[in-house]
């Protein structure tokens, strides 16, 4: 006999640059959620931060928010009707801790990291400063502001907005002219920028963590085939052949898994995270790159692939997250 089904509110969209990725991720969730265990409703957030009830059919169209949909005036009262919220939102609104803060204030249960962890992890600079205290190895970097002297910078470098995901606003500069151009581009995404040494001869490696109650399931290592470039937006969400499960040196594999578990705990993450690394092939050194507290759940995203590779079916990944 089946028990009472848990009622789940799935949120997606948002007004961030990663809105489209969220729409792709939510399709993966609804295609894999176990409907023998969960009832669910969809609520989409448009680019103006308006909230709407949405159906599975509506979200097939990426312009779902242009339709005549039922607008939700009070999302708090609406969310209180559900047992748990699954906020499948990338970028600001969720990964910067805003939604979590609101849910915590009203005692609404949700999937994923809390507001404290999300705020720190979303800001690349805060993450770097935090993890430096724990001797986590990182690529040399400088914090850019209007007073930064860029005349002494050694090229190539990689320019990153501090608060933006999906590799948006990130570019590799090979000279001063390109650096100035890419700083301008990065400033469109965030007012704070970091400039890192770009390791040309590298491997981009990733590790996924899924929390199963108090147990942490740490994946094997994924690798991004970057062909000497870097893991940009298209590599993450368009070019399906750019991700593989990597066979790597046993010691390096264990080093990555141990760092990942430690970082997850240091940053007080909850539920899930994907942790990214750069491996310098010349110096044989591993560097932490970034942590993602709500990784993509598209058909080609690394997080579900890596966890699935541990033997956990896609639907069971979602079930574990919803049953925490």
Model-derived regions, located:
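Active-site nucleotide/adenylate-binding loops and adjacent lid/helix of ATP-dependent enzymes
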Residues: 2-12, 16, 24-27, 79-80, ...
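ATP-binding N-terminal substructure of ATP-dependent carboxylate-amine bond-forming enzymes
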Residues: 2-116, 121-122, 126, 145-148
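Hydrophobic beta-strand scaffold residues
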Residues: 40, 109-110, 138, 157, ...
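Glycine-rich phosphate/pyrophosphate-binding beta-alpha loops
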Residues: 91, 167, 224-227, 292-306
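Conserved metal-phosphate-binding beta-hairpin within the catalytic cores
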Residues: 209, 264-299, 307
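Peripheral (often C-terminal) accessory segments that flank ATP-dependent C-N-forming ligase machineries
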Residues: 247, 266, 281, 319-324
